[in-house]
Swiss-Prot record:
PROSITE patterns: NC1_FIB
PANTHER family: COLLAGEN ALPHA-1(XXIII) CHAIN-LIKE ISOFORM X2 (PTHR37456:SF6), SI:CH211-266K2.1 (PTHR37456)
Boundaries of every Laminin G-like domain copy: 71-236
Region spans: Disordered: 278-608, 625-772, 851-1625
Stated name of the protein: Collagen alpha-1(XXVII) chain
Protein encoded by which gene: COL27A1
Residue stretches of biased makeup (Gly residues): 1033-1042
InterPro entries assigned to the protein according to its UniProt record, in alphabetical order: Collagen, Collagen_Structural_Proteins, ConA-like_dom_sf, Fib_collagen_C, TSPN-like_N
Propeptide: 42-624, 1622-1860
Regions of compositional bias (Basic and acidic residues) in chain numbering: 1202-1220, 1241-1253, 1326-1338, 1350-1360
Length: 1860
């Protein structure tokens, strides 16, 4: 039918052309095609990428993780996670008949799905999977269709999938290739809108599709698949573009080359494909808007116009359209094209003087197929033979080649030849480059005069088949089918023709660099005729034009116009400068040129045909911009002149059937066809043999225009062209995406030895060593040189105020000194009148330092000036360097013990104090009540096998246990020997043990008898000799139980029995009796600091305790922060009225008097009368601090102050009764991260942790590297029982073995007979600790008191215990006795200020206390080093003036001050009269502290010097005399945290603390001694296969796979954001370094030659500090992952140069002190994950502080955690088979307080929910938490777990939280 249609089309076209209506008919067809293209509307499509939230239009919208947008689409990496409900992605209105249009490129070969649609029941409904070599369409569960299409070849693929009914069709090549598959099943009616649409994978745990995707659209109209190329986005054609620096393909007449900018991928030419139809089944040729006429002068013919988007290629009917019509001419040009692209022209009728030249269309396939093979590129071979050379026969086969005759070479024939396999494929010379592989490499430079041939490349396209449909086999003859389609129907070949062999699919260089223009007719060659020609190839036309042509005469061309191109008058020909010799190999050459760039001056060539060259001097870059929109169809132009014969076009798609033609003449009988494939329907008969070919019918009418051809695959890369001139500079491209970080390169060879370097800087000193023993005092040395200024020390804690010193004597005024450096702060001069506040001046420039002046003598104290106004509060200055730690001050006076105040609210838990010395053993306390039984602890590891101990004494008979659960029914035993009937007599002696009997016959199972009464145990007989092991007898029926005999004496101890199989856990036994209270043990070592427990509920207030004895005076603690403003006190009692005093006049201000001795407290006088209001006096000077007065009466109780430091724990008080259970407090917000404190002492050992719950099985990790040999693991779960083995032969009796390891408890047996008490047996070996039993109901009697055991060794440090469950409310306890007075405890560290307490009730008035003795004068502390001058602070805002302070005591006379500057005269007011004294008012509220005023000591009196310029900071002066204590300053703002100071000396012990609260429940006691091992039983029969064991827990990390080859080095990424500051205080360090550099020559170049002087001049502490800082910085730059040198996160270790393996490392996210480093597991296989393991696998607790966790959250972008709940008959997530959550579904609390729950906003991924199966066996439910909000993980609690009972249990298995 196809052949007939083609012939009909040709015939019609030829007839139309013959009638002269060719141009009109072409114009009608072109207009009709334009109308169709402009009116055809695209159906509504669904853009899947846009529905998934990926859009090119939203500028700046962030892409999801793992998705990288680029110009043409999106790149999906392994981290891409795209999932959405099906209803939101694929609307239900689309229906079931869909068309999927795809444009993609795979980057990784795997088995990934491009997409998958799953229903709510998680069944696969629709999916597309790319396998290596296959493309599989999944249409349901286990329903799929596979196509032979390899998507993993690294190329871009544009295809469509049509789903219509029961047919699935793969459409490629823009609709020219269609592979339909009929489904043997029905598809699902519709997609479940409530399901899920997963992009890139089949399920959340499957492998991810990695590649680029330009378009993924779904159309509801299935016809879209046939012309899907019209619906492709224009960016998809540019998806795989590149700019190739190709040289000029054509030379201009002016000689200037031009530049190509080729883009193969844009043209779709990475793998050119052609379709090879059967013989004679192709139309003559196709062009975009024209027709192709044959070269025959009398019968021009044409074909129907094709789709306007379709172009044709050189090579005849076996070509595929290459370019869409939307591309401009510059874009369509490509030197790789083996065809002329564009509209074809009508062939002109050649005159007699014109040589008729024809084009031979040949191909070079990879193989000669026996079936319709993959198409291959057609090449036009051109060769100019010598005139004397005969035409070489073309390599056509006998079955397809028309009859040819050898023509003389008078008409300059150009025969077509194809290289044969026997000949060398390519004759390379040294100058010819090797053919590159099929990639996108540029062509070598080539011109028409170049001597280097242009190799061409032919490729084949992979054959697309389906497993459901086989292509029909092509008819074969005795010879192989031809590699191309012949153009004539003559059956007999010429005698000179040869059979076509398989030409190699290699690049064959041509003999000349000729080129054919894009739209100009190609140079014809003999041996080929246009389609439809009835003449033999090369016969008629060649003979007519042959004699009139000469070898060197140019071939003139008739002027004409090509369709939609420039006139042919613009074309020029130029002779080829080089003519090949006859011996040259004839090779095909690619010819291509755009017609609009050809000139019109023909030049003769030596070979007789023209070479076209470009006209003009304008270079034409191919990629000047993206293709513009499709223009409107223009009006038909006037008919052009006839052109040269066109080359046959590619086969178009099959058109609609035309009208039936008249019956043709009967044709010759054809060969019998092959047997057809069997039909799909069962029972249908096989297809019969194919009938003979019918007679050719009449030519039908031309069909409508075919569909647009698909975009061809990119062709192979040719040789590089010559280097062209550089093109115009392009616009800057978009910023590329950062490439992946390359692997570290190999370690290079060591370089040559360098020259000797300069003397390096002095090395850094190490950390300060420990203090050595104090040596003998040395001889006083000479006064040394002034040392360099040291780094300021750490600020010490504020010491207590010292005593006021005596006033110094007045010194004589010294001589005037040289003006010195500008000092820090001038001394206070005579105070003038207050002047007006001036404006703030500008900051002065820093002056040069002046010379240092001599120290002046002590000046005469100046006259005290008038007090000035209170100054403004200065701005906050920069924090100073830490000062040196102050010495502890003198002890204060012992005060009387005040009255006991009301208990304040509980403050926060303080830090643990230092470990005190162990105290003496106290008296034994009263026996306490037995505590509540704790939860079962974790099972310990199996200890070493102990030696067999001596026989122990017999234990007391225990209470009768509860009956155990009924065991599994055993196999029926052998029938017992029937006893003789008789009266039951006394039991006789037990006879000797007989030999084992032979195996009895298998007896029938007897009826199970009723259970008899329990009898007495008979006496054990004498053990007989051990017999040989007999074969186990077959089980018989259960015999009736015999009567109980009396209990016999215990037998001797038998050998240890074989380890039995682990039985099921028995019921919980009753509670044992409470043991006697043991003696008080020694004080254990301090445990680690426990985790803060949850806030307890408010307890019941206890009775008020007795007044304790007076404790020792404690050392004053450090000054606490200022407390909050207290409430105003209550008014005191009113005193008696005093007499009214006369108003005194205001006297002159006297000098300050000396400090008076403290007077005795006088008695309170009577209240006087109100005096007249006095005149307010002037503000007096601040007096010196007076001596402390006598202690006054105890005032009323003030408001609660801040919480003081926590003292050491006092002696243990008596056990109080349990308080009421307090209410649960709300979780407070996380506080700000505090300053890293000094590492505290090692805490006390924690309690034994409880046994954790079994965690979830984690996801299978990647295979890690081989780790070190680990400790023996716990026993695994029971495996699946294997098949029962055959009975083994009887082995020899083995020697008695050593006692085996403790076996796991076996199955519960039947109740045994109660025996008599046996003698004391030897003590057995120590057994394993049994599992915790359940609480019993009965309470046993107390056991006898045990002996006092020896003091045990110090145990290993236990893990911190869990917070205990809140206890029940206890009974009010009796008042305890006052405890003994304890030793003073050490002062604890300074605590944080507690919350402001509520106002306490007024306490009773205390008695008059005795006057305390004056304290001793403390030793004067050492003088601290002067700190450097601080940076001048910024000007602060003017504060509010504070209220006037109380007048201070009269101070001592100050020293003479310097003469101050004259102040501006202020307004002097007259003094008012003194008023009457007013009524005494109530005490006012305490005002806010006033602003700090400037105060200075009086300076020396000297002449005023000239004001010098402000100098730089001078050297620190000599140590000055200690000054008097200044006024307390205002509380400054919080400074920056200073560097951690060195550990201070241990302070004296503090006061005895209050009685502590009752401690938590202790760990469970040790397991008792193991009982006597019973006798070894005989080997029992094989048991029934056990039930399937539980799924094992997650295994350890596997071995790391071998290191893969290093990937290509990625492009450098964009510059990263500026790095944050290091955790060190850079301001401090920078100032310290600057000070050191400014004040020393250590870093100056001239100092290198004096290293000795440098070392002598520096202090040791400076270098120690520098050395420490250098090591610290080096450890931060290159972390090792150790505890001493941790990394921030594991990813920092992976970025280091050395290769790291998966394992355990130490990290410190906040890079603070190394004491808070945490141990994590680093998973470098998964990109450097930081996996934080829980403390135990059964609890959601992690050993990390909240500060470190906050930093870890900030350093991470995503986190994953797995939690598995193992359950027994317990539902934790969903009930039954539905999707409804259970009533008691568990909830998970995240780190940030959010809740993960079923149906909530945050839900975990539940990959397996086995807990909904309740069949009496253990199951598990796996929860996966994967989030990109690191604040959510790890999970900190699992809530709503149902309570465990005997039949319902659960265990938690908590996996690590892995941060990335």
């Amino acid at each position: 039918m196809g052949a007939g249609s083609a012939r009909g089309a040709r015939g019609t076209a030829a007839a139309a052309a013959a009638r002269g209506g060719g141009f009109l008919f072409s114009w009608i067809l072109v207009s009709f095609a334009c109308h169709l293209a402009s009116t055809q509307g695209a159906p509504e499509d669904v853009d899947i990428l846009q529905r998934l939230g990926l859009s090119w239009t939203k500028a700046g919208s962030p892409a999801p993780p793992g998705v990288i947008p680029f110009q043409s689409g999106f790149i999906f990496t392994q981290r891409a996670r795209l999932q959405a409900p099906t209803g939101t992605v694929i609307p239900a209105a689309l229906g079931t008949e869909l068309a999927l249009v795809l444009s993609l490129c795979s980057h990784r070969v795997n088995h990934a799905f491009l997409f998958a649609v799953r229903s709510q029941k998680r069944k696969l409904q629709l999916g597309l999977q790319f396998l290596p070599g296959k493309t599989v369409v999944h249409l349901g569960s286990r329903r799929s269709v596979a196509f032979d299409l390899d998507m993993h070849d690294g190329r871009w693929h544009h295809l469509a999938l049509e789903l219509r009914g029961r047919t699935v069709t793969l459409v490629t090549a823009c609709g020219q290739r269609r592979v339909p598959v009929l489904l043997p099943f029905h598809r699902d009616p519709a997609l479940d809108p409530g399901g899920s649409f997963l992009f890139g994978k089949m399920n959340p745990h499957a492998v991810q599709f990695e590649g680029a995707l330009c378009q993924f659209s779904i159309y509801p109209v299935t016809q879209v698949a046939h012309n899907y190329c019209t619906h492709l986005r224009k960016q998809c054609g540019q998806a795989d573009t590149y700019q190739s620096p190709l040289g000029p393909l054509f030379s201009q007449d002016s000689g200037r080359p031009f530049t190509f900018q080729s883009d193969l991928a844009l043209l779709g030419l990475e793998n050119l494909t052609t379709a090879t139809p059967a013989l004679g089944s192709l139309p003559a040729g196709r062009g975009p808007r024209g027709t192709v006429a044959p070269a025959t002068p009398t019968k021009p013919q044409r074909t129907s116009p094709t789709n306007p988007h379709q172009h044709m290629a050189v090579g005849g009917p076996a070509q595929t359209p290459l370019l869409p019509a939307k591309l401009s001419a510059s874009n369509a040009l490509d030197p790789m094209l083996p065809a002329s692209v564009g509209g074809s022209t009508r062939t002109p009728r050649p005159a007699a003087a014109q040589p008729s030249q024809k084009i031979t269309a040949t191909k070079i396939p990879k193989s000669l197929p026996t079936k319709p093979s993959a198409p291959s590129t057609s090449i036009v071979p051109i060769k100019s033979p010598h005139p004397t050379q005969k035409t070489a026969p073309s390599s056509f086969t006998k079955s397809a080649l028309p009859t040819q005759k050898q023509v003389p070479p008078t008409s300059r024939p150009v025969p077509a030849r194809v290289s044969r396999p026997a000949e060398k494929p390519i004759q390379r010379n040294p100058g010819m480059p090797r053919p590159p592989p099929p990639s996108t490499r540029p062509l070598p430079p080539t011109t028409s005069s170049s001597k280097k041939p242009i190799p061409t490349l032919a490729r084949t396209e992979a054959k697309i088949t389906s497993h459901a449909s086989k292509p029909a086999s092509a008819r074969t003859s005795t010879h192989k089918p031809p590699p191309f389609t012949a153009l004539s129907s003559s059956p007999a070949p010429t005698p000179g023709s040869t059979r076509s062999t398989r030409p190699p699919a290699t690049m064959v260089p041509p003999t000349s660099g000729t080129s054919t223009p894009r739209t100009a007719p190609a140079v014809p060659t003999p041996g080929s005729a246009p389609t439809g020609s009835k003449k033999p190839i090369g016969s008629e036309a060649s003979k007519k034009a042959g004699p009139k042509s000469s070898p060197r005469k140019p071939v003139p061309l008739r002027p004409g116009k090509a369709a939609r191109d420039v006139p042919l008058s613009d074309l020029t020909t130029r002779p080829s400068p080089r003519q090949p010799q006859p011996s040259q190999q004839t090779t095909p050459a690619l010819v291509l040129a755009p017609a609009q760039f050809l000139s019109s001056s023909p030049r003769p060539t030596s070979s007789g045909y023209s070479i076209f060259h470009l006209a003009g001097s304008t270079p034409f870059p191919l990629l000047m911009g993206p293709p513009g929109p499709k223009g409107d169809c223009g009006l038909p132009g006037p008919p052009g002149l006839p052109g040269l014969p066109g080359i046959p076009g590619a086969r178009g798609p099959r058109g609609p059937p035309g009208p039936y033609g008249n019956p043709g003449l009967p044709g010759p009988p054809g060969a019998k066809g092959q047997k057809g494939d069997p039909g799909l329907s069962p029972g249908k008969a096989h297809d019969g043999a194919k009938g003979d070919m019918g007679l050719p019918g009449l030519s039908g009418n031309p069909g409508p225009p075919g569909r647009k051809g698909h975009k061809g695959y990119p062709g192979p890369a040719g040789h590089p062209g010559e280097q062209g001139q550089p093109g115009p500079e392009g616009s800057p491209g978009a910023k590329g995406y950062p490439g992946r970080q390359g692997l570290p390169g190999p370690v290079g060879d060591p370089g040559p030895k360098g020259s000797r370097g300069y003397i390096g800087l002095p090395g850094l000193f190490g950390l300060p060593g420990s203090d050595g023993e104090r040596g003998l005092p040395g001889v006083p040395g000479k006064r040394g040189k002034m040392g360099m200024p040291g780094f300021p020390g750490v600020f010490g804690e504020r010491g207590p105020p010292g005593l006021d010193g005596n006033p110094g004597e007045l010194g004589l005024p010294g001589p005037p000194g040289v003006p010195g450096l500008i000092g820090d702060l001038g001394v206070l001069g005579p105070i003038g009148y207050p002047g007006p506040k001036g404006m703030k001046g500008l900051m002065g420039s820093v002056g040069e330092p002046g010379l240092k002046g001599d120290k002046g003598e002590q000046g005469v104290p100046g006259v005290s000036g008038d007090p000035g106004f209170q100054g403004d509060k200065g701005s906050q200055g920069l924090p100073g360097f830490p000062g040196a730690r102050g010495k502890p001050g003198p002890l204060g006076k012992v005060g009387d013990k005040g009255s006991i105040g009301f208990p304040g609210p509980p403050g926060p838990e303080g830090f643990p104090g230092d470990i005190g010395p162990p105290g003496d053993n106290g008296p034994e306390g009263m026996k306490g009540k037995p505590g509540a039984r704790g939860l079962p602890g974790p099972r310990g590891q199996l200890g070493p096998e102990g030696d067999e101990g001596p026989m122990g004494p017999p234990g007391a008979p225990g209470l009768e246990g509860q009956p155990g659960r009924k065991g599994f029914p055993g196999r029926p035993g052998l029938d017992g020997v029937k006893g003789e009937p008789g009266d039951p007599g006394r039991p006789g002696p037990v006879g000797e043990q007989g030999f084992m009997g032979f195996i009895g016959l298998v007896g029938e199972p007897g009826i199970v008898g009723e259970k008899g009464d329990r009898g007495m145990m008979g006496p054990p007989g004498v053990p007989g000799p051990k017999g040989s092991m007999g074969h186990p007898g077959m089980p018989g029926g259960m015999g009736t139980p015999g009567e109980p005999g009396p209990q016999g004496p215990p037998g001797s101890r038998g050998p240890p029995g074989m380890r039995g199989a682990k039985g099921r856990r028995g019921p919980r036994g009753p509670d044992g009796p409470a043991g006697e209270q043991g003696s008080r043990g020694l004080k254990g070592p301090p445990g680690p600091q426990g985790r803060p427990g949850r806030p307890g509920q408010q307890g019941v207030a206890g009775e008020r305790g007795h007044l304790g004895s007076r404790g020792f005076p404690g050392i004053p603690g450090p000054s606490g922060p200022p407390g909050t403003k207290g409430l105003p006190g209550e008014p005191g009692p009113q005193g008696p009225q005093g007499p009214i005093g006369p108003p005194g006049e205001m006297g002159p201000k006297g000098p300050p008097g000396a400090v008076g001795e403290p007077g005795l407290p006088g008695e309170a006088g009577m209240k006087g009368d109100l005096g007249p209001l006095g005149t307010p006096g002037e503000q007096g000077l601040i007096g010196q601090r007076g001596e402390p007065g006598l202690e006054g009466d105890s005032g009323p109780m003030g408001p609660d102050g801040l919480k003081g430091d926590r003292g050491d724990p006092g002696p243990d008080g008596e056990h109080g009764e349990k308080g009421q259970e307090g209410l649960m407090g709300e979780d407070g917000p996380p506080g700000p991260p505090g300053v890293t404190g000094v590492r505290g002492p090692e805490g006390k050992s924690g309690k034994q942790g409880e046994k954790g719950r079994t965690g979830a099985k984690g996801a299978k990790g990647y295979q890690g590297q081989l780790g070190e040999m680990g400790v023996p693991g716990d026993p695994g779960p029971p495996g699946t029982p294997g098949p029962k083995g055959s009975r083994g032969s009887l082995g020899p009796t083995g020697a008695p073995g050593r006692m085996g390891a403790q076996g796991e408890p076996g199955l519960a047996g039947y109740d045994g007979h109660k025996g008599i008490v046996g003698p004391l047996g030897p003590p057995g070996p120590k057994g394993e600790k049994g599992e915790q039993g359940e609480d019993g109901k009965a309470e046993g009697p107390p056991g006898p008191p045990g002996d006092r055991g020896p003091v045990g060794d110090r145990g290993d440090r236990g893990e911190p215990g869990d917070p205990g469950y809140p206890g029940q409310e206890g009974v009010q306890g009796l008042r305890g006795k006052p405890g003994q007075q304890g030793q003073p405890g050490h002062p604890g560290p300074r605590g944080w200020p507690g919350p402001k307490g509520s106002k306490g009730a007024e306490g009773p008035k205390g008695k008059q206390g005795k006057a305390g003795a004056p304290g001793r004068r403390g030793v004067q502390g050492l003088q601290g080093l002067p700190g450097p001058r601080g940076v001048v602070g910024r000007q602060g805002l003017e504060g509010i003036a504070g209220p006037d302070g109380l007048p201070g005591r009269d101070g001592q006379a100050g020293q003479q001050g310097e003469q101050g500057d004259d102040g501006d005269p202020g307004p002097m007011g007259p003094a008012g009269k003194r008023g009457n004294p007013g009524v005494a008012g109530l005490p006012g509220a305490q005002g806010p502290p006033g602003f700090k005023g400037e105060s200075g000591l009086p300076g020396q009196l000297g002449p005023p010097g000239k004001r010098g310029t402000e100098g730089r900071t001078g050297l620190p002066g000599n140590q000055g005399e200690p000054g008097s204590k200044g006024q307390p300053g205002d509380s400054g703002e919080m400074g920056f945290p200073g560097m951690a100071g060195l550990f201070g000396p241990k302070g004296p012990p503090g006061d005895i603390g209050f009685k502590g609260i009752q401690g938590p429940r202790g760990p469970p006691g040790l397991m008792g001694k193991e009982g006597i091992v019973g006798p070894l039983g005989i080997l029992g029969p094989s048991g029934l296969p056990g039930p399937k064991g539980d799924k094992g827990s997650r295994g350890d990390w596997g071995l790391q796979g071998p290191r893969g080859p290093p990937g290509p080095r990625g492009r450098p990424g964009p510059p990263g954001p500026p790095g944050g500051p290091i955790q060190l205080q850079q301001d401090d360090l920078g100032a310290a370094f600057q000070t050191w550099m400014d004040t020393s020559g250590a870093l100056r170049p001239e100092s290198y030659s004096y290293p000795d002087r440098l070392v002598l001049d520096q202090g040791g502490e400076i270098f120690k500090t520098l050395h420490y800082l250098s090591n610290l910085i080096q450890s931060i730059k290159t972390p090792l992952g150790t505890k001493e040198n941790p990394a921030r996160v594991c990813r920092d270790l992976m970025d280091c140069e050395q290769k790291m393996v998966d394992g355990t490392y130490w990290v410190d996210p906040n890079l603070g002190c190394s004491s808070d480093t945490i141990e994590v597991s680093c998973n470098f296989t998964h990109g450097g994950q930081t996996c934080l393991k829980p403390i135990t696998a059964s609890k959601v607790e992690f050993a990390i502080s909240r500060v470190q966790m906050n930093f870890l959250h900030l350093l991470s972008s995503e986190v994953t955690q797995h939690i598995t709940i193992h359950c027994l008959n317990m539902t934790v997530w969903q009930e039954g088979t539905g999707q409804t959550p259970a009533k008691q579904a568990v909830r998970f609390r995240a780190w940030n307080g959010q809740i993960f729950e079923a149906g909530g906003q945050f839900r975990p991924e539940v990959s397996m929910d086995g807990c909904k199966v309740q069949d009496g066996r253990w199951h598990q439910t796996l929860f996966t938490f994967r989030t990109q909000d690191p604040q959510q993980l790890p999970i900190i609690s699992v809530d709503n777990l149902p309570p465990a009972s005997s039949g319902k249990q659960y265990r938690l298995e908590v996996g690590p939280a892995c941060f990335l």
